[in-house]
């Protein structure tokens, strides 16, 4: 399924049904009193989250949603039927924004969360309502009111406990694929990942965490260069970021430069992202010998100064993956984030 994280839709609530003017007409009662019923209320438009969606692609093809109008009132004081509501399903993590005012109506982060986005029109009154001691045969009835109309902007921000980031071809997708159920594409060329992918990492039959893989970042990503910039927002809800680094490069100075490229892009894009816990994951240790690893790591750590956590792994050989999964789980568990 194609990934789409922005959409604009039009929602139209149903109009209220008009009241009716009518009079009782039965055998032997040719001139009965008023018996016009009220109309029915218009249907409402709701948005509700579901777990089986992770894209807004459906709204690329269907953009207008209209609830049913209320029925007009009937004679014999019968009320018109209320218009049926409609419930539009959206992925968890969708922000609902009024397109005209930029007001955030709701940030939908819970399963089965339901929010009213367009209220149906109020019913009109039948002429029975206007009977009085001074007006025995009222002919007046009122019309139902129009339902609300709104233009909504939907913005999906995926929900994951952990997010991965790094340069293209650093091994992010291989890591995510080998520790979770994610079916990410893997190949030895840059920009293999073209859209965010979520994977579930199972700890046991009850406990798990969700990890997000976004396209690789390059210098200038925060200003729109490359593929990853448009997906950086999907890291905003993550509690922990894993910075995946290719340690197999010949010149360790290039490694240092690449690390700072990613950190600078985070800071430029969003200080919230830059201030999140970031663990450094040095990947591709299978491509160099232990002496080179230790020499490079020592030089890198000296240049970086204090860092929160670091790991040495080979994502493709699955070396060190159990350790990092355990550390992530402990981190999330200790902070009551699971």
From Swiss-Prot:
The keyword Iron-sulfur does not apply. PROSITE patterns: G_OBG, GTP1_OBG, OBG. Monomer. It holds the Pfam family MMR_HSR1. The keyword Metal-binding applies. An essential GTPase which binds GTP, GDP and possibly (p)ppGpp with moderate affinity, with high nucleotide exchange rates and a fairly low GTP hydrolysis rate. Plays a role in control of the cell cycle, stress response, ribosome biogenesis and in those bacteria that undergo differentiation, in morphogenesis control. Signal peptide: none annotated. Belongs to the TRAFAC class OBG-HflX-like GTPase superfamily. OBG GTPase family. Its cofactor is Mg(2+). Residues 160-333 form the OBG-type G domain. One of its GO terms (biological process) is ribosome biogenesis. The lineage of its organism: Bacteria, Pseudomonadati, Pseudomonadota, Gammaproteobacteria, Enterobacterales. Its EC number is 3.6.5.-. Residues 1-159 form the Obg domain. HAMAP family: GTPase_Obg (MF_01454). Keywords: Cytoplasm, GTP-binding, Hydrolase, Magnesium, Metal-binding, Nucleotide-binding. Mg(2+) binds at residues 173, 193. Its main location: cytoplasm. GO terms for molecular function: GTP binding; GTPase activity; magnesium ion binding. This is GTPase Obg.
């Amino acid at each position: 399924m194609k990934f789409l994280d922005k959409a604009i839709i039009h929602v139209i609530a149903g109009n209220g049904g008009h009241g009716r003017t009518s009079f009782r007409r039965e055998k032997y009662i040719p001139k009965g009193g008023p018996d016009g019923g009220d109309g029915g209320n218009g249907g409402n438009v709701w948005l509700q989250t579901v777990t089986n969606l992770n894209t807004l692609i459906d709204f690329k093809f269907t953009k207008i949603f209209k609830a049913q109008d209320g029925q007009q009132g009937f004679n014999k004081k019968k009320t018109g039927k209320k218009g049926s509501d409609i419930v539009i399903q959206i992925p968890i993590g969708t922000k609902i924004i009024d397109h005209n005012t930029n007001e955030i109506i709701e940030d939908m982060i819970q399963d089965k969360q339901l929010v009213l986005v367009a209220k149906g029109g109020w019913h009109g009154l039948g002429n029975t309502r206007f009977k009085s001691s001074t007006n025995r045969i009222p002919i007046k009835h009122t019309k139902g009111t129009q339902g609300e109309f709104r233009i909504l902007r939907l913005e999906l921000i995926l929900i994951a406990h952990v997010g991965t980031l790094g340069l293209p071809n650093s091994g992010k997708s291989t890591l995510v694929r080998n520790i979770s159920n994610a079916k990410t594409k893997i190949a030895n060329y840059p920009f293999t990942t073209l859209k965010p992918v979520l994977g579930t990492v199972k700890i046991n039959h009850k406990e798990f965490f969700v990890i997000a893989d976004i396209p690789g970042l390059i210098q200038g990503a925060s200003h729109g260069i490359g593929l990853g910039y448009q997906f950086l927002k999907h890291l905003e809800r993550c509690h922990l970021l894993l910075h995946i680094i290719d340690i197999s490069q010949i010149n360790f100075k290039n490694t240092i430069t690449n690390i700072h490229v990613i950190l600078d892009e985070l800071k430029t894009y969003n200080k919230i992202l830059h201030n999140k816990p970031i663990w450094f994951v040095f990947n591709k240790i299978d491509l160099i010998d232990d002496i080179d690893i230790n020499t490079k790591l020592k030089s890198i750590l000296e240049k970086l100064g204090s860092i929160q956590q670091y790991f040495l792994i080979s994502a493709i050989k699955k070396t060190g993956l159990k350790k990092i999964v355990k550390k992530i789980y402990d981190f999330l568990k200790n902070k009551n984030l699971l």
